[in-house]
Amino acid sequence: MVGAAGSPYHDGLFLFDLHLPATYPTAPPEVYYHSFGLRVNPNLYPSGTVCLSLLNTFDGEGVEVWSPARSTLLQVLVSIQGLVLTADPYYNEAGYDAYAGTPGGRRNAASYAENACLLTLRSALHLLRRPPRGFEGVVGAHFRRRGAHVLAACESYLRGTRVAGDGGDGGGGERTCSAGFRLALRNVVPVLAAAFAEIGVEGCERFGDGELGQCSLTAIDDSAASADASD
């Protein structure tokens, strides 16, 4: 599954195992997420558990839970794509939707989106280094096709562009991504670019430590100067 545009998961690759138990379709399918030990989303556990009402791994009622008469595998996949890998995963945490639209909620959503973006990049590295058996070609083909787009987005973040989500619409959130996020990104991107270069993605050389570091530090200095001027 590919992360959607407009979310912190954009262009990321997410692999799930689906198993149909003997009790299917009376019981829902069993779904395992290849997490590499990372918590990229409130619904995707490091253990591989996918927390979703439709899978009976989270509380729900009515159409939210599995029904042998109406629920389908397609519905499971669409739910993961549309309800889990969202633009604002922070609000997927139980009870956090009550903070949607508040200044505190926006700040927390922005911070969570930044972390989700970083973990998505780290997941990409794990996939490139240790793709699940039988999926080596899928992983390589995806990142050869989208790797340049991933790096371009990272370059934009290093210049201050905010990660997609609820954090910066003028209602109490930040207009740019945080300096801490850019510093963390500065460490991840050169490693990711090197991994992309190994599979044939072009243009990765300009994302080396030297030039990238100067770009990110300049963006952070500019952001700090703007903040000082507004105080």
Residue ranges and their predicted role:
Residues 5-7, 20, 41:
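Residues embedded in well-ordered secondary-structure elements
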Residues 30-231:
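Domain-scale recognition of soluble eukaryotic interaction modules
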Residues 19-25:
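Proline-anchored loop/turn motifs at beta-strand termini and strand-loop-strand connectors
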Residues 1-12:
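N-terminal onset of structured domains
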Residues 10-11, 27-30:
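Short, hydrophobic/aromatic beta-strand segments
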